[in-house]
């Protein structure tokens, strides 16, 4: 009779040793069960994961829908004194409190759904916002002030990061607040230096403040986000390299080299991608198939972000410069239909992403355990305001030696006051790999408090302050109070400048754009060589086809409006 014994069983093979009465030993080796082709969950675990993902999608869409209704109510009932970002953050806080009560009563557990995931923010929500900012940029005012904007965005952000980071480090060494090492202090100073003056820009547009002030604040905020992310990544890179045995000068030089590589490498990659997209859509005529044309634009819009992140550069910096270049060259190679479609789609997607970010920012108060240290929070707020002042006032006085349009003390004060913090600092704070966990909770809690403090208090009081210091343009003073509108959604306007160079023929471009304008430097080089090389000059046939296409769309719209939903023409007189 055979006796069966199981032995030597491992994850790789199943070994069976059979001993028989004849003394013959037979060892059978059975193959390992096949692994799944993809590392996916199966069975009950897969079903639970699918249910959790479904609830996350449902919850996110529900939050967006409620926020859209809220923005609609702000516009309809003319609650123009309240910026959209402040309203959406407040709604997020309210919804977070309700969810916390539901969880406490054990009616449901939505804790996972309300979590603000940094990877989702950086991969899905932030790229459309940054690309739309670059694509809708008024490039005339931007490049006329590019020197001042770059100085504020790069050197100003670095100054603020060093002031905040250095202050936190030395206060910790003096046992005034919790201790952080040098790299962690600089990482926190870098992430908290990212300004996000969405509410302030809406107020600037509503009150028609000085256009130079508007562009300085807006331009700084666009570049500042990318610079802050690069500085934070630089600090994290130094932490990963364990540079405790390296001298201070070597640390500084390596950090500077890493920053320059990230900044200029990412900017060059984004610029190159934008130029390639212009050449592709210039020589491959997709204007008669707008769906293919639009699809190609969407691909090129996200392409530099993925490539930059894949080769350890800054995807945010790359996608920003790609958006600027594509709006300057590629946009004019598109058909009129795709031009309009691209602008409206980018506005819509950016609005949804911004709304989602601000809503989940409010929800995040209840998302994870907090470590609140009152002295740390107060000193951080003081350092943030002081770092912003050290950034704005000295650089403004320095720039006034070289500027024709001077930055007045009132403008400096508004620029200092408009340094609101948004979702980028919070997402970066969750992305930091700080140890132990109490340190991460302290940084996350402090960042949330600073962000909410600047958005709710500073953002909500910007309009009364502008009224008080009388920084409005002369035309704005003649506007009645009922015309003041703080809704970014309602005041979107035209994203791209009105002069569509692609609508000019070769002769018209030469006669009306180059000869009649006194262009110098890069603007002359761009108008004379770069623009003709990267954009398509229309023939008379192309121009005629474009006009027919737009006329057909206009007639179709008019027919739908004239007939109305019932198909009758009885209401035609009421429309006109």
From Swiss-Prot:
Transmembrane segments: 55-75, 79-99, 118-138, 151-171, 186-206, 256-276, 306-326, 349-369, 374-394, 412-432, 446-466
Xref: NCBIfam families: b_cpa1
Compartment(s) where it occurs, according to its Swiss-Prot or TrEMBL record: Golgi apparatus membrane; Golgi apparatus, trans-Golgi network membrane; Endosome, Multivesicular body membrane; Apical cell membrane
Species lineage: Eukaryota, Metazoa, Chordata, Craniata, Vertebrata
UniProt record similarity statement: Belongs to the monovalent cation:proton antiporter 1 (CPA1) transporter (TC 2.A.36) family.
Pfam family, any one: Na_H_Exchanger
Recorded catalytic activity of this chain's protein: Na(+)(in) + H(+)(out) = Na(+)(out) + H(+)(in)
Sorted UniProt keywords: Antiport, Cell membrane, Cytoplasmic vesicle, Differentiation, Endosome, Golgi apparatus, Ion transport, Membrane, Phosphoprotein, Sodium, Sodium transport, Spermatogenesis, Transmembrane, Transmembrane helix, Transport
Gene Ontology cellular-component annotations: acrosomal vesicle; apical plasma membrane; Golgi apparatus; Golgi membrane; multivesicular body membrane; trans-Golgi network membrane
Tissue: Predominantly expressed in the liver, skeletal muscle, kidney, and testis. Expressed in both renal cortex and medulla. Detected throughout the entire gastrointestinal tract, with high expression detected in stomach, duodenum and ascending colon. In gastric epithelium; expressed in the glands within the fundus and pylorus regions.
Principal subcellular localisation of the protein: Golgi
Lipid bilayer topology: Multi-pass membrane protein
Phosphothreonine modifications at: 505
Provenance organism: Mus musculus
Claim: Cell membrane is one of the keywords in the record: yes
Keyword Transcription: no
Phosphoserine: residues carrying this PTM: 566, 568
Mutant phenotype after disruption: The deficient mice have no obvious intestinal phenotype, show no defect in Na(+)-absorption, have normal serum Na(+) levels and no signs of diarrhea. Apically expressed Slc9a2 and Slc9a3 are increased in the small intestine of the Slc9a8-deficient mice in compensation. Deficient mice have a reduced gastric mucosal surface pH, a higher incidence of developing gastric ulcer, and a decreased of mucin-2 (Muc2) expression. The intestinal mucosa in Slc9a8-deficient mice is prone to bacterial adhesion and penetration, which in turn promotes inflammation.
MF annotations from Gene Ontology: potassium:proton antiporter activity; sodium:proton antiporter activity
Cited function: Na(+)/H(+) antiporter. Mediates the electoneutral exchange of intracellular H(+) ions for extracellular Na(+) in 1:1 stoichiometry. Acts as an Na(+)/H(+) exchanger in the trans-Golgi. Contributes to the regulation of pH regulation of Golgi apparatus, and consequently, in protein trafficking and endosomal morphology. Plays a crucial role in germ cells in acrosome biogenesis and sperm development, probably by playing a role in the fusion of the Golgi-derived vesicles that form the acrosomal cap. Can also be active at the cell surface of specialized cells.
GO biological process, one term: sodium ion transport
Highest taxon of source: Eukaryota
Name of the protein described by the UniProt record: Sodium/hydrogen exchanger 8
């Amino acid at each position: 009779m055979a006796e069966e014994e199981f032995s030597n069983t491992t994850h790789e093979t199943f070994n069976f040793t059979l001993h028989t009465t004849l003394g013959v030993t037979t060892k059978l080796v059975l193959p390992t069960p096949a692994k799944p082709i993809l590392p996916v969950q199966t069975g009950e675990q897969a079903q639970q994961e699918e249910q959790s993902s479904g609830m996350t999608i449902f919850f996110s869409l529900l939050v967006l829908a409620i926020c859209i209704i809220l923005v609609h109510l702000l516009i309809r009932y003319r609650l123009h004194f309240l910026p959209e970002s402040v309203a959406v953050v407040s709604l997020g806080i309210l919804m977070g409190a309700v969810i916390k009560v539901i969880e406490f009563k054990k009616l449901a557990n939505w804790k996972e759904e309300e979590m603000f995931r940094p990877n989702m923010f950086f991969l899905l929500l932030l790229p459309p916002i940054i690309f739309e900012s670059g694509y809708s940029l008024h490039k005339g005012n931007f490049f006329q002030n590019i020197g001042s904007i770059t100085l504020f965005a790069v050197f100003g952000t670095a100054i603020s990061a060093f002031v905040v980071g250095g202050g936190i480090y030395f206060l910790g060494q003096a046992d005034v607040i919790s201790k952080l090492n040098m790299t962690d202090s600089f990482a926190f100073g870098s992430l908290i230096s990212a300004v996000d003056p969405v509410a302030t820009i809406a107020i600037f547009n509503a009150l028609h403040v000085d256009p130079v002030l508007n562009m300085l604040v807006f331009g700084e905020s666009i570049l500042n986000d990318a610079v802050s992310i690069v500085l934070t990544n630089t600090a994290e890179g130094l932490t990963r390299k364990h540079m405790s045995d390296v001298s201070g000068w070597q640390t500084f030089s390596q950090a500077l080299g890493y920053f320059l590589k990230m900044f200029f490498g990412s900017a060059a990659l984004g610029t190159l991608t934008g130029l390639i997209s212009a050449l592709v859509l210039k020589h491959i005529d997709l204007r008669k198939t707008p769906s293919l044309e639009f699809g190609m634009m969407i691909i090129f819009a996200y392409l530099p972000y993925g490539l930059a992140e894949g080769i350890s550069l800054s995807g945010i910096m790359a996608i920003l410069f790609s958006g600027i270049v594509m709006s300057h060259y590629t946009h004019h190679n598109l058909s009129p239909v795709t031009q309009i479609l691209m602008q409206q789609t980018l506005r819509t997607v950016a609005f949804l992403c911004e709304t989602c970010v601000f809503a989940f920012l409010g929800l995040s108060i209840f998302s994870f355990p907090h470590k609140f240290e009152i002295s740390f929070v107060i000193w951080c707020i003081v350092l943030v305001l002081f770092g912003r002042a050290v950034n704005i006032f000295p650089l403004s006085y320095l720039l006034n030696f070289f500027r024709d349009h001077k930055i007045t003390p009132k403008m400096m004060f508004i620029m200092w006051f408009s340094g609101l913090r948004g979702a980028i600092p919070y997402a970066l704070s969750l992305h930091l790999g700080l140890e132990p966990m109490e340190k991460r909770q302290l940084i996350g809690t402090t960042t949330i408090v600073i962000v909410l403090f600047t958005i709710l208090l500073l953002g909500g009081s910007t309009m009364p302050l502008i009224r008080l210091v009388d920084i409005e343009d002369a035309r704005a003073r003649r506007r009645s109070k009922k015309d003041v509108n703080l809704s970014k959604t309602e005041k979107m306007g035209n994203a791209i400048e009105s002069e569509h160079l692609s609508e000019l023929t070769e002769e018209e471009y030469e006669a009306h754009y180059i000869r009649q304008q006194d262009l110098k430097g890069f603007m002359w080089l761009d108008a004379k060589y770069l623009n003709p090389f990267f954009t398509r000059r229309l023939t008379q046939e192309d121009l005629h086809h474009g006009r027919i296409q737009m006329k057909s769309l206009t007639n179709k719209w008019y027919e739908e409006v004239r007939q109305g939903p019932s198909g009758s023409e009885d209401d035609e007189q009421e429309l006109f």
